[in-house]
Amino acid sequence: MIKKRLDSRTVRRVLPVAALLAVCMAYASMRGAPALMAAVATRELPVYNVDTEEKVLAISFDAAWGRANTEELMNILDRYDVKTTFFLVGFWAEKYPDLVQELVSRGHEIGNHSATHPHMAQLSAAQIREELRKCSDLVKSITGKPTTLFRPPYGEYNDTVVKVSREEGYECVQWNVDSLDWKNLGTESMVKQCTQSVNPGDIVLFHNDSKYILEALPRILEYYTQAGYKIIPVSQLLLQGETWIDHAGQQHLCTPTPAPQPEGAAAPTA
């Protein structure tokens, strides 16, 4: 059974490994991961993948330029009973409102991919905020629903991009499995990219209008299904509760350290 993973409260920091080890030694008697994290100099990171033992992963599509393939993509996903996340640029949503509505009606999740697809790391905090809000307003005017996930265009970000997006109520999401479909290397290359190393909690990246997506996607879905994976939208993959993000962008639950037991006390039983 797949557990629901919504409304996560993320400790949105990355812990340098050496610093983390030092802190763990210094604070070995203290309880709780958040206390450790607060003591460490950190930087902002998006979520690249999730730490889970469940055989679940998320497929995501970025849509910025054309509508080619999008209807057939939805048909393929329907055939495999798969729901995914589409990160939409504002001008794409404005140009193709029918596709946005159809995506939602078929059960797919919509994420924010900026209003104009700029290089976000080159923008000021105010400009980043404007990009997020314009895209959000456009999507909401079409779907009636707010967006809660953000993916920076080109995968480019800095601390300000991640920080501002989270101040705006978004979880900033990247990917750790890249189909490289934008390189047009062929169907076999895409399939290999997406199947050569698959792990629970992966987030896979595609683009809706890539040249070989219609040929490659069914084979990739077949592979995941036969390997026993359940494919879910990104928001359902994200962990629920207090979380932290490691140096590689993997999201983890904050598991508190067990309280010391009084001397002579019986060990807890399952």
Question: Where are the model-predicted features located?
Answer:
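Terminal accessory/targeting
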Residues: 1-59, 75-85, 200-270
